[in-house]
A protein has these predicted regions:
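N-terminal and secondary-structure boundary signal
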Residues: 1-356, 361-377, 382, 387, ...
Length: 419
């Protein structure tokens, strides 16, 4: 569905994309329909906020796909925009352990190709948003002051919120862990409070490889092959819920938005008519054990968080052995490995390669693969997408895999099978 409007104002595009080439081609074709909201000045400051909440490769379904980010940066460059910042405020242990998510996901190398700046929103100058119970939380000021703000979320399930798409992605605009934790005193209301304050001009949803099951970091990837573009985060989240096979009443913050009048019956009618049946791919629902449900019960979750943020608990949570315990019990989804990946070389086992070109379809920077694998091309950013999708395991890595070992253990087989 190239483009439809609600009330001659709210616009939504639904694009089917199966390769890096199609993503770029269809994004270039779709974005002119939104040209009236783009800044007139080519010196306008444009902020892009992807979902980089973890160091997990986008093909696991966790983070924003670099193929989509590259296509967007390319489009903005070709339109003449010169001042671009990619900002993200990674949460929890990655922030605490000082793990550089931009580097681990190769966003730094991609940004360099387009002279885009990187900004860790956890350390940005801030303003304040009002939360429930009279609390104030710090929000990166750039998110309210940029001339044009593009939200670039991932479509994935979330064991607390049901789904994480446009509205939930704004959590990454909060400065530092304590401010992010403030949302949990009344999570669903505060998601809405945050979105009433921080209002991106455009939303581009990565539904290429989404995540189902126990997201946001322990689910499984699911191939959806969709990109959604729109101006209203409530409408887009409704569309994404429909695609994932959820009723809006199953998503607590969407049900609350309906109660507050942020979602009208007209929105619901639009979604029913807009989403084609062939686009609906019912996701597996999040499932957590009794301990996780107990700790995350809204009645006492905030009390647990206050205890968690005490100096003694901070020390305990930083211990590797305690982290292993948290992962084993399901209380923590992410693995905070401080050992970086050191990629020395990638090579092709020519006897195994059948030249299926799948590696080329997933390369964010458009290398002619597998030919340009040997030797490692100077334009390669080391994202390892080609390695992860090769069905014959013909692409080999040399170097210290570091944190990436754990991802391979969990996702190697399923990533190759779905792609």
């Amino acid at each position: 569905v190239p483009h439809k409007t609600l009330n001659n104002n709210l616009r939504v595009s639904l694009l089917e994309c199966r390769s890096a080439q199609q993503i770029r081609q269809k994004l270039y074709a779709a974005l002119p329909a939104f040209s009236d909201i783009f800044p007139a000045s080519k010196d306008a400051h444009i902020l892009i906020k992807p979902n980089l909440n973890s160091n997990m490769n986008a093909l696991t379904g966790n983070t924003t796909d670099l193929r989509l980010l590259e296509a967007l940066l390319s489009y903005l460059r070709d339109q003449g925009y010169r001042v671009i910042t990619i900002g993200e405020g990674t949460s929890s242990g990655f922030h605490r352990e000082k793990i550089n998510i931009f580097s681990r996901l190769c966003v730094d190398k991609l940004a360099k190709r387009f002279n885009a700046k990187l900004l860790d929103l956890n350390f940005a100058p801030y303003t304040h948003v009002g939360f429930e119970y009279g609390e104030k939380a710090a929000v990166a000021r750039i998110c309210t002051e940029a001339d044009f703000f593009i939200n670039l979320p991932k479509l994935k399930t979330h064991f607390e919120a049901g789904l994480s798409v446009c509205l939930k992605n704004m959590m990454g605009t909060l400065v530092g862990l304590p401010n992010k934790q403030k949302t949990h005193r009344s999570l669903f209301k505060n998601i809405l409070n945050l979105n009433k304050f921080v209002k991106p001009h455009l939303h581009i949803v990565d539904g290429l490889i989404a995540m189902e099951g126990t997201g946001p970091s322990s689910g499984t990837p699911v191939k959806v092959d969709l990109v959604l573009i729109g101006t209203d985060p409530y409408l887009l989240d409704l569309v994404c819920a429909k695609i994932a096979g959820f009723e809006y009443k199953e998503i607590p913050y969407l049900m609350l938005a309906k109660e507050q009048g942020l979602i009208t019956q007209e929105y619901l009618n639009f979604v029913e008519a807009f989403v084609p049946k062939e686009a609906i791919k019912p996701f597996k629902r999040p499932h957590v054990n009794m301990l996780v449900r107990f700790v995350n019960n809204p009645k006492w979750q905030y009390s647990f968080i206050k205890i968690r943020l005490s100096p003694i608990m901070n020390k305990l949570f930083s211990l590797k052995s305690f982290g292993t315990f948290l992962n084993a019990t399901g209380l923590r989804q992410d693995v905070f490995d401080t050992q970086d990946l050191c990629l020395q070389q990638m090579c092709l086992e020519t006897a195994s390669c059948d030249n299926c070109k799948k590696c080329q379809a997933y390369c964010p920077v458009g290398l002619n693969l597998p030919e340009q694998l040997q030797p490692l091309h100077e334009q390669c950013i080391g994202c390892l997408y080609c390695f992860l999708v090769c069905p014959k395991k013909a692409i080999k890595i040399k170097g210290d895999l570091g944190f990436f070992k754990e991802q391979l253990k969990r996702y190697d087989a399923i990533t190759r099978s779905i792609t």
